[in-house]
Amino acid sequence: MNLYFGDIPICYSHSTAMVLQAAGYDFRSDYLEAIMAMGNGATLVKKDDRHPLVFFDNGMPDESISHCLQILGFDYEEFFCDSSEPVNVIELKEKLKKYLDHGSVIVGPLDMGYLTYNLNYNHLQGVDHFVSVYDMDEDWIYFHDPAGYPCVKMDFRDFCKAWKAEAIDYKRGAYSMWGNLQRNKLPTSQEIYHSVSVIMKQRYENGEVGIIEDYAKTIRANGLNAEQKQLHQFFSFRLAAVRSLYLSQFLKDYDPVRADLKEKIAV
């Protein structure tokens, strides 16, 4: 099947691709998305007897960015802190500046409800997002937003409100960033495949059991409410489909059985 390229919310893969490209490494977003192996299994994100919410993944974007860089042979610096800890904005700015001395920086998750240049920000509270930061000065931060906003200029203190990611549960911590990327290993394609397979296996083994089956039973009994319909129509189904498609493309030369299975899941 042909690959799909279009408006899909894989901001963490797009931002990683932009930062890698700025450092002189060309990796397409679909390839990075496959290596991150996000689209396997399912996670219950809202418990409700009649209308629960389920995401069709079982990995966090911030952890997946780190896994992806490691799999591809990159050394890098990363930072995040406990969301409950107070943060000195001046110290945070200095750390980001130090990262920027070595090139662009992956930053996120951000809470899109604070990204006021996006006309829909009022409806995006608690939605996670990642961007590629390429510069900053005394008051402003400059970045590319893969949601359709290149060359954004934003007040740094306002940006920090989004960067705290207080309303986002699926993260390692607040104020996360990755920078100073240097590729010191050149793994073979077979080695990359093996590393991805190990992560997929671990995520399936550590994931919750029976979520999709239980979710289907609940839908049969109670139908879908407006929140569920909106989530699946505008986000989760199309994201799950493209993740399966990209992973199918990645697996086809090494594991045609699983590649075929992923393609069937996509359609």
List each model region and its residues.
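Short, contiguous, pocket-lining structural segments
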Residues: 11, 125, 236
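Residues that form generic nucleotide/phosphate-binding pockets
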Residues: 22, 35, 68, 95, ...
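Noncatalytic regulatory segments and standalone regulatory/sensor domains
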Residues: 138-242, 247-253
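Short, charged/polar micro-motifs that form catalytic or ligand-binding hotspots
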Residues: 5-6, 55, 123, 230, ...
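Active-site-adjacent substructure of cysteine-protease-like catalytic cores
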Residues: 25-46, 51-57, 86-136, 144
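Long, low-complexity C-terminal extensions of enzymes
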Residues: 248-249, 253-267
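Cysteine-nucleophile protease catalytic domains, especially the papain-like/related folds used
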Residues: 1-89, 181-182, 187, 192
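Exposed alpha-helical structural elements
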Residues: 15, 31, 64-67, 91, ...
